[in-house]
Swiss-Prot record:
Family in the record: Belongs to the FGAMS family.
Annotated function: Part of the phosphoribosylformylglycinamidine synthase complex involved in the purines biosynthetic pathway. Catalyzes the ATP-dependent conversion of formylglycinamide ribonucleotide (FGAR) and glutamine to yield formylglycinamidine ribonucleotide (FGAM) and glutamate. The FGAM synthase complex is composed of three subunits. PurQ produces an ammonia molecule by converting glutamine to glutamate. PurL transfers the ammonia molecule to FGAR to form FGAM in an ATP-dependent manner.
Top-level taxon: Bacteria
EC number: 6.3.5.3
Designated gene of the protein: purL
InterPro entries per UniProt: PRibForGlyAmidine_synth_PurL, PurL_linker, PurM-like_C_dom, PurM-like_C_sf, PurM-like_N, PurM-like_N_sf
Binding positions (ATP): 57, 96, 500, 537
Protein name per UniProt: Phosphoribosylformylglycinamidine synthase subunit PurL
Binding residues annotated for substrate, in chain numbering: 99-102, 121, 245, 317-319, 540
Phylogenetic placement of the source organism: Bacteria, Bacillati, Bacillota, Bacilli, Bacillales
Keywords linked to the UniProt accession: ATP-binding, Cytoplasm, Ligase, Magnesium, Metal-binding, Nucleotide-binding, Purine biosynthesis
NCBIfam families per record: FGAM_synth_II (TIGR01736), PRK01213.1 (NF002290)
């Protein structure tokens, strides 16, 4: 739309054009009051995008305040591009997770690829070198052709971007449930390393300093992407393909190197990624955080399309762009630095003292808005909350143990459930060894990456069982954090902190808002007990298709510190003769389990219970035993229960099996999904020391028979399974479904 054709302020009000941009009548009245006049078209666009849920968190802020965000090691909590945690020796780890759900639903390859690109920029804008990527993905059932297409394209998009840019994709999770059929979830996480003195903030300090635009040129892609992410998907969403950005990983690779060199220069004052809401959010947020204003001359914006209006330039979400503030008089150094990498760096404005964001185009002022009004003063809504109707019904159900006729057949069927089955088809497309720092590759409880120049490593994982959270949001929220910590501990790491990606339906529905509140309550309590503060994250609402919401999916991304790489532990059995231990008590808990879903085609009842104090005690004991060199392998018991966990530890080894005896009712002993449980193997000579250090029950030993045999307490054989056959079933399940 050319400037001549844009509606005037009176038309915007009378024809309610602001509503098409996502502003309510009340919000538009607030804008009018803030400005003391009617806004023009560009100004209306600025407010609509900055006040969207995606940028302002206006529906979720009251809930997010419940998270613990400080801790001894926390150097930067929520509010910047990414959070930062101290790991000793003047080094810190920088990490964040974000969603790209709506774009991936309609343009899966580019949606996923640009999700990866955006999260990488958040990390290097802090001054950190990105060292690893992870992802957490949710899709419908693979029997559907549309789901197959989305799954294949999302994985290809993540691989295409990550592999080209040269950052290893080392871990993640993929789950399949019918509720994600029309609305897949694509959450990407990036982890970086930094020295303390290199930490940079997205702040525009120093009146008179120069505002520069660096990186790729601006096109019309992604306009109103943030607003698009703040509404439900519908049939008309397909028409919004232009709102999906297009990524160029090679450009981003150059941008990383140029920015990391720039960060070493004392000419740099502040730096921020142009992410959601592009130039608008980066300029308004940098000015607001510093208590300053910014003037920008939009004729100087590098444009790759002709005739772009101020509105289009400010709202474009073209990829691979950064906004920087540099000391006045040092601009040429910056231009030269970026030129060396073949990238543009242009002066397009200056920092001012009056806290206003002013935009000029073709010699005229086209917008004048208080920076704080855009970045900080979006309305905050305390949405009504109402317990979901199904919850009381599920809580009152008398839970029966599912009827299982044949334990071996059931185990094989569980190993072939896509959520449990091997994800090798996925991660074999990712380069997880590039940079040669990956110590534990995908497929174990957590990935581990070496901290170069030290004996240390970083363990990292993404976790969330959304079925449990649907059944009981508060308990499920606790379990999500606890399971992430369990995976870190099983890998030899001390849990440090989390980033989260809160994926929910429409928050304007009281039952959905109740899910949000309760799951955040549960997560917050777990974070406090396990001492893993929340250092940043992302909220993705309106994940619905035709009014049906996805399961509440607050994904947890956790990073832990492996103090010495010789403590690194993996899940597979190591040698015949080692003793097998189970830690934790098994109860007949099947609500939300893989067995329940497989046998009944749906989930119902109560989620498994969790005692966070018991969880913490077990994790501390196990980590101490690992650090004392007493543990051969460690694996948390998750989907599918003990039978699956023991089988996975055998499948990962070569030529090894196990003979195990489990007490209690057979179906529960094998397949229940009780929490805070671990399968651990120990060398025979360490038996006494291990049993002194950890409250554990020896249930059997590792054999060289290549079979897993499980007995009941009467010593009757419940099942015997050949490990090669299990491996074939487990590895073949997803490729078979995709054929």
């Amino acid at each position: 739309m050319s400037l001549m054709l844009e509606p005037n302020p009176t038309q915007i009000k009378e024809e309610r054009i602001y509503a098409e941009m996502g502003l309510t009548d009340e919000e538009f009245a607030m804008v009018e009051k803030i400005l003391g006049r009617l806004p023009n078209y560009t100004e209306t666009g600025l407010f609509s995008v900055m006040w969207s849920e995606h940028c302002s968190y206006k529906n979720s802020k009251p809930v997010l305040r419940k998270f613990p965000t400080t801790g001894e090691r926390v150097l930067q909590g929520p509010g910047e591009g990414a959070g930062i945690v101290d790991i000793g020796d003047n080094q810190a780890v920088v990490f964040k997770m974000e969603s790209h759900n709506h774009p991936s639903a309609i343009e899966p390859y580019q949606g996923a690829a640009t999700g990866v690109g955006g999260i990488i920029r958040d990390v290097f804008s802090m001054g950190a070198r990105p060292v690893a990527l992870l992802n957490s993905l949710r899709f419908g059932e693979l029997q559907s052709p549309r789901v197959k297409y989305l799954f294949e394209e999302v994985v290809a998009g993540i691989a295409g971007y990550g592999n080209c840019i040269g950052i290893p994709t080392v871990g993640g999770e993929v789950q399949f449930d019918p509720c994600y059929e029309g609305n897949p979830l694509v959450n990407a996480m990036c982890v970086g390393l930094i020295n303390h003195e290199d930490i940079k903030k997205g702040q525009a300090h120093g009146a008179g300093n120069t505002v520069m635009y660096v990186g790729a040129s601006t096109g019309r892609d992604g306009i109103h992407g943030a607003t698009f992410a703040s509404e439900e998907l519908s049939e008309s969403s397909e028409a919004k393909r232009p709102a999906v950005q297009v990524g160029d990983p090679f450009m981003e690779k150059l941008l990383i190197e140029a920015c990391l060199e720039l960060i070493q220069s004392d000419a740099l004052v502040g730096i921020q990624d142009m992410g959601a809401a592009g130039l608008t959010s980066s300029s308004a947020e940098m000015a607001s955080k510093a208590g300053m204003g910014i003037e920008m001359y939009l004729d100087d914006v590098p444009q790759r399309e002709t005739g772009m209006t101020p509105y289009e330039m400010m709202l474009s979400e073209s990829q691979e762009r950064m906004l920087i503030v540099v000391k006045k008089g040092r601009e040429q150094e910056i231009v030269d630095l970026f030129e060396k990498y073949g990238l543009a760096a242009v002066t397009m404005g200056k920092v001012t003292e009056d806290k206003m964001l002013r935009l000029f185009h073709k010699g005229e002022m086209v917008a004048e808005v208080p920076a704080d009004a855009l970045a900080e003063e979006a309305p905050i809504y305390h949405k009504p909350s109402q317990e979901a109707a199904y919850f009381a019904e599920f809580q009152q159900m008398k839970m029966e143990t599912p009827k299982v006729e044949n334990y071996k057949e059931t185990l094989f069927a569980l190993l072939q459930q896509p959520t449990i089955a091997s994800k090798e088809w996925v991660y074999d497309q990712y380069d997880y060894q590039v940079r040669t720092s990956t110590v534990v590759t995908p497929g174990s409880d957590a990935a581990v990456v070496r901290v170069r120049g030290t004996e240390k490593g970083l363990a990292m994982t993404t976790d969330c069982n959304s079925r449990y959270i649907y059944l009981d949001p508060e308990v499920g929220g606790k379990i999500a954090v606890a399971e992430a910590a369990r995976n870190i501990v099983c890998s030899g790491g001390e849990p440090l902190a989390i980033t989260d990606c809160l994926n929910f339906g429409n928050p304007e529905k009281p039952e959905i808002f109740w899910q949000i509140e309760k799951s955040v309550d549960g997560m917050s309590e777990a974070c406090r007990t396990l001492q893993t503060p929340v250092i940043g994250g992302n909220v993705s609402m309106y994940n619905e298709r035709s009014g049906e919401a996805v399961y509440p999916t607050p994904t947890v991304g956790m990073v832990g510190l492996v103090h010495d790489l010789k403590h690194v532990t993996t899940q597979e059995f190591k040698q015949a003769g080692d003793l097998v231990y189970v830690i934790g008590e098994t109860k007949a808990e099947f609500g939300g389990s893989e067995l329940q879903k497989m046998l009944h085609g749906k989930i119902f009842g109560q989620s498994p219970s969790i005692d966070l104090d018991v969880e913490l005690k077990r994790q501390k004991q196990i980590l101490a035993a690992i650090q004392a060199g007493l543990v051969q392998s460690a694996h948390d018991v998750a989907e599918g229960g003990l039978a699956v966990a023991i089988s996975e530890s055998a499948i990962g080894a070569n030529g090894l099996g196990a003979t195990v005896k489990l007490d209690g009712e057979a179906t529960a002993a094998l397949f229940a999904e009780s929490q805070s449980r671990f399968v651990i193997t120990v060398k025979r000579e360490n038996k006494e020391a291990f049993e002194k250090a950890v409250e554990a029950i020896q249930v059997g030993e590792v054999t060289n028979t290549n079979e897993v045999t499980i007995h009941n307490e009467e010593n009757e054989v419940l099942l015997t399974a050949n490990v090669d056959e299990m491996r074939k079933a487990w590895k073949g399940a997803i490729p078979c479904l995709l054929k």
